[in-house]
């Protein structure tokens, strides 16, 4: 039976309201604030100290003890170093997925259950657990599934798709049935107006409000290279480092009638291939190679293992619509995704996240995306128009 719950308290309204809801349900609640980035670093501009003060204030109002854990070294090793390595290799990483996998739902989760001896962990994520918002169904011995929340606009299952099934089995999402507006209304009702009015954090914490190109140049040395037209092979401009660009990004090259967009990056030669036009075939893909998936749904994993293929739904950006797809295993044991409709700017290093109608099934890092062949492009460009605008 679940009695004692550790809540990851960030200083924001969502985690504070989650702690309130847990206390109202009668759980013994312990708040823990995670410090993952060292603000002494001259580049990082996270609002860590202000967030800590807000977390302390919220816990005082709730009568909940607050402790701190420091994962700065572990975050640097497991998340930030990987982030830099990927950019130097021409990839575009997702540090939020890595942070959830390695820090919040691994180190922190284990600390809460094994070191502190608590029964479960709760977070302020907008997601649902099939065992219940408060793990009411944990005694059933059923596997937990990561379900889409009531507030589909705030859905954060995309960023949780890399966590382990073991961690999910002992994780509560008290906000799973709430709309964001309801959370803010409740916060005001219980005296948390200052948190309800607080601006939501967006983007990458360690970048803060800085321009990304300015930030990344502090860690990766610029290296001048060519922009090559992917059709003609002609040099149409120069860049100052492949780490400053991502697939689909507009290059803003002068002296050309049509705008150019990044189609592909080649780290070995420090070359960026660019395509003329927003929906150039080189920017559209239906076939994707991915790493072996991290499965949150054992049934889907078993279907793929038994039959060699799985019908599901796909996205690689959390704000984009889901697209039907088929995930398969090739004879060479490669995992392949075939989309029913082409998508624009599918980016190596990002994550393919798989869904059914109600749940997030798992995720896999994208290795490559094959561009549309020109002879098929005209009809498929029209098919893609509604998805890539």
UniProtKB/Swiss-Prot annotation:
Disulphide linkage map: 99-205
Protein name: Mitochondrial tRNA-specific 2-thiouridylase 1
Residues holding ATP: 8-15, 34, 124
Species of origin: Drosophila melanogaster (Fruit fly)
UniProt feature coiled coil, ranges: none
Group of enzyme by EC: transferase
Gene Ontology biological process terms in this record: tRNA wobble position uridine thiolation
Region Interaction with target base in tRNA, annotated ranges: 94-96
Site entry: Interaction with tRNA: 125, 250, 350
Further comment: During the reaction, ATP is used to activate the C2 atom of U34 by adenylation. After this, the persulfide sulfur on the catalytic cysteine is transferred to the C2 atom of the wobble base (U34) of mitochondrial tRNA(Lys), tRNA(Glu) and tRNA(Gln). The reaction probably involves hydrogen sulfide that is generated from the persulfide intermediate and that acts as a nucleophile towards the activated C2 atom on U34. Subsequently, a transient disulfide bond is formed between the two active site cysteine residues.
Keyword tRNA processing part of the UniProt annotation: yes
